Design a protein with these regions (language model features):
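Active-site neighborhood of glycoside hydrolase catalytic domains
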Residues: 175, 179-183, 189-198, 202-275, ...
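Active-site-adjacent "subsite" loops/lids of carbohydrate-active enzymes
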Residues: 40-60, 131, 136-190, 283-287
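Substrate-binding cleft of secreted/luminal carbohydrate-active enzymes
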Residues: 286-312, 328-407
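Aromatic-lined carbohydrate-binding/catalytic grooves of carbohydrate-active enzymes
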Residues: 72-109
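Aromatic- and acidic-residue-enriched segments that line the glycan-binding/catalytic groove
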Residues: 87-102, 137-163, 200-222, 267-278
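Beta-strand-rich modules
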Residues: 479-500
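Catalytic domains of carbohydrate-active enzymes, especially glycoside hydrolases
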Residues: 60-86, 190-194
Length: 510
């Protein structure tokens, strides 16, 4: 190995936006765009594949998901860590999930902190980790014999409401709201997550002929409101409390919610969308995403637009426009239903261009900054004709997630490359973690000549390397085959909010 310390030029400088005639290319392939996939654990939808799988297989399968989506140039995973009053991590507030260990309340054997391990593996591959929780759903059915004695169904039976084949936490009870908030607080305090994520399950979807019996709570706490407004106020209060708690503990941790795709139909509210949805957020789930945005309680919203582009009752294209026009104070990403590809009664989903077309039209709205896809197994060794289209077009290049809303700032620090070495196999150098800062990643960019370096061009992204808590130095290794076209590289820092520093140029000139 040859030490090139005296022949390599190292320059730290401000890289201005250098478009170089690539404006159209950068618009087509944005540098910052949220690209996420949901990893559902409930009833083993995505992972673990079976609750009886051994730990080694579970780890291998999780890594396979990460590696698959890294190759597809995704940058975030939304992992379900609480689905039915259970947990994928050690806690006194809920039992271990049976979907992880085969028996509720039983820890993994051999023991490991599943959540901590998942976060480390996720960050090591450059992904954000969004911890997905279902706050109100307590069980999947009425078979309570499967529950641990430590489940809230047994510890607090007065918190439960029986409805539609499941048990739910009563959203009206202050003690329930406090308990669920404490669960969120514990995860934020203990784990290096990037976000807390709730999905569309607030009050349950209506079932004809069934009553969600919160009558006693309404009589006690209704305070003169209609039952509909009272239910919405219960959800709003919970969302507000969770938001305040997260930001009080770690202000860089995001709070995101993925609601049902229709706020209200225009037929009942002139502000609503041109849809004929059988149920809506506002009227049936008693969830009001517009209020959450207006009050700045959430960092991002991911409306679930699980319909085809021209669905007659809920058109993806019409709903996309509606959410863009009604967004405020909040990042908006769109939830896409990849699970419907080649499996839905709507035959539009048989067209391999449906998802690519949805991404294209999403990018045409400046108020929308990316997409999330349900769910992970959709592109895991299946639907390869769709993934081929994505990797050749929409997701040809890597992208960074968007900056946490309201947290855009200029980073005062810049990275420094040390111990620069090159050999026929690779070029290497070290980057040290800066003192008194919150830096998560080192970004590496490459171009053939110094004048061509443009950190706004996603085609120049070579790597994204995570700092580990126990290691304040990372080694950057650039294989020689990448340097054939990228003889010069630039490095930047990414902080915990997603802000990027100015760049340091590393010129491999012999």
């Amino acid at each position: 190995m040859k030490n090139c310390k005296h022949t390599l030029l190292l320059i730290t400088f401000l890289l201005l936006s250098f478009w170089n005639g690539n404006a159209q290319a950068l618009a087509t392939n944005p540098k910052n765009e949220f690209r996420a996939v949901w990893i559902a654990t409930v009833v083993n939808i995505d992972w673990p594949k079976m609750s009886t799988d051994n730990v080694a297989k579970q780890k291998a399968d999780y890594i396979e998901i990460l590696e698959t989506y890294k190759k597809l140039n995704y940058n975030a995973v939304i992992v379900q860590i609480r689905s039915v009053g259970d947990a994928f991590y050690p806690t006194e507030l809920a039992p271990w999930s049976r979907f992880l260990t085969g028996k509720e309340g039983q820890a993994p054997k051999p023991y490991f902190d599943t959540l901590a391990w998942m976060i480390a593996e996720t960050h090591a591959r450059g992904f954000e980790f969004h911890a997905w929780m279902n706050p109100y759903r307590a069980t999947m059915d009425y078979n309570t014999s499967l529950l641990s004695p430590q489940h809230d169904f047994f510890k607090h039976p007065d918190w439960m409401i029986k409805y539609g084949g499941k048990y739910y936490y009563n959203p009206a009870l202050p003690e329930v709201q406090n308990h669920l908030t404490a669960i969120v607080e514990e995860v934020v305090e203990k784990y290096d997550i990037d976000a807390i994520h709730f999905d569309d399950y607030f009050y349950p979807y209506r079932i004809k002929g069934e009553l969600f019996d919160d009558t006693a709570s309404y009589k006690k706490y209704g305070n003169g409101l209609s039952i509909e407004d009272w239910r919405r106020s219960n959800v709003n209060n919970f969302v507000r409390c969770v938001s305040l708690s997260i930001k009080n503990i770690k202000p860089w941790v995001q709070f995101g919610i993925s609601p049902f795709g229709v706020w209200r139909n225009k037929s009942v509210d002139p502000r609503g969308s041109e849809t004929e949805a059988g149920q809506t957020n506002y009227d049936d789930l008693f969830a009001d995403p517009l209020a959450w945005m207006e009050n700045k309680w959430i960092d991002y919203l991911v409306p679930q637009l699980y319909w085809s582009m021209d669905h007659p009752k809920a058109s993806y294209s019409k709903l996309l426009r509606w959410w863009s026009e009604n967004s405020t104070n909040t990042a908006i990403y769109i939830g896409n239903g990849t699970y419907k590809i080649n499996t839905d009664s709507d035959k539009r989903w048989n067209n391999p261009n449906e998802i690519p077309n949805q991404i294209d039209i999403t990018r045409s709205y400046k108020n929308i900054q990316g997409n999330a896809f349900f769910s992970a197994k959709s592109f895991l060794n299946r639907n390869q004709n769709v993934t081929k289209l994505l990797t050749e077009n929409q997701y040809k290049y890597a992208a960074l997630p968007t900056v946490v809303p309201g947290s855009i700032k200029k980073m005062a620090i810049v990275p420094t490359a040390n111990n620069i070495l090159i050999d026929p196999i690779a070029s290497r150098f070290n980057v040290t973690y800066p003192l008194y800062s919150k830096v998560r990643y080192v970004m590496v960019y490459g171009a053939k000549f110094n004048s061509k370096i443009d950190i706004n061009d996603p085609s120049q992204i070579i790597d994204k390397i995570a700092f580990k808590d126990d290691n304040n130095t990372v080694e950057v290794v650039i294989p020689s085959y990448k340097l054939d076209k990228n003889t010069t590289c630039a490095i930047t820092f990414i902080d915990f909010y997603g802000n990027e520093s100015e760049a340091t140029l590393v010129n491999f000139t012999l």
